[in-house]
A protein has these predicted regions:
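Solvent-exposed loop/turn and edge beta-strand elements of beta-rich ligand-binding domains
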Residues: 1-234
Length: 234
């Protein structure tokens, strides 16, 4: 409250209103009148009257979008891998002076509960590109780690690589990415599966009244798997 103000017309401006990582909308009213949007209010100071200028600031967290993409290559079909692969998106925030972990759900909200995002339930598969995609909107700006927590397929070795916003490919199952205000942060993972292999050695001994040449022309072998597939020399 400012007293002894000379009579006349005044402009009242809120010059500092921004807070890091927050979006703000400012409204004002003069003498209880209709609310207006803006940071500057025009008001008249009249004799023996009190002119009231009321400002209201509404703050919301700045948010961006996190787009996760998964490509599966090698000796595992996308259908086989879909039931195996899960991800966690995690960040650290300060609450009451202490750093605590928060997880991101498919709706973009932060939760105290460890949350897993699954290829089968949360991602969408594009048959043309062969990629799984999850778009998480309304993610509060900040630093996040995206970890592929389950990736192993029985009988296979797997190599995991990732890239952020189309950058260089890195080896590993955990990517660190920054979500910025109004932008889409793209994190692409690729799993390349290779079946475990060994060596099968066959030996054949020929005895009796037959020559090696005769046996070579007559003897043949087949090797089949449990599901009836044939194995070649390679």
């Amino acid at each position: 409250k400012i007293e002894n103000v000379e009579l006349g017309n005044y402009t009242v401006t809120e010059t500092t209103k921004d807070i890091d990582e927050k979006n703000v909308s400012v409204t004002y009213s003069v003498n209880g009148g209709e609310s207006q949007t803006g940071t500057s209010a025009d008001a008249a100071v009249e004799k023996d009257e009190t002119t009231t200028v009321a400002f209201e600031n509404s703050y919301v967290n700045q948010t961006g979008t996190l787009q996760l993409t998964k490509t599966i290559k090698g000796d595992v079909t996308p259908e086989e891998a879909a039931g195996l692969l899960t991800f966690e998106v995690k960040t650290t925030v300060t609450e009451n002076g202490e750093e605590v972990d928060k997880w991101v759900g498919p709706d973009g909200k932060l939760t105290d509960t460890q949350t897993k995002l699954t290829l089968e339930k949360d991602f969408t598969f594009d048959e043309e590109t062969g990629k799984y995609t999850l778009i998480i909107s309304n993610v509060v700006v900040g630093e996040y780690t995206i970890t592929e927590t389950d990736k192993d397929a029985e009988g296979n070795d797997v190599t995991v690589t990732y890239s952020i916003n189309g950058g260089d490919s890195q080896t590993g199952d955990t990517a660190a990415a920054e979500v910025t205000n109004g932008e889409i942060t793209k994190v692409e993972f690729e799993n390349d599966y290779t079946k475990h292999t060994g060596t099968l050695e066959l030996t054949k001994t020929i005895k009796g009244d037959i020559t090696e040449e005769e046996a070579n022309g007559a003897l043949r072998f087949e090797i089949t798997t449990e599901d009836g597939k044939w194995i070649g020399k390679d």
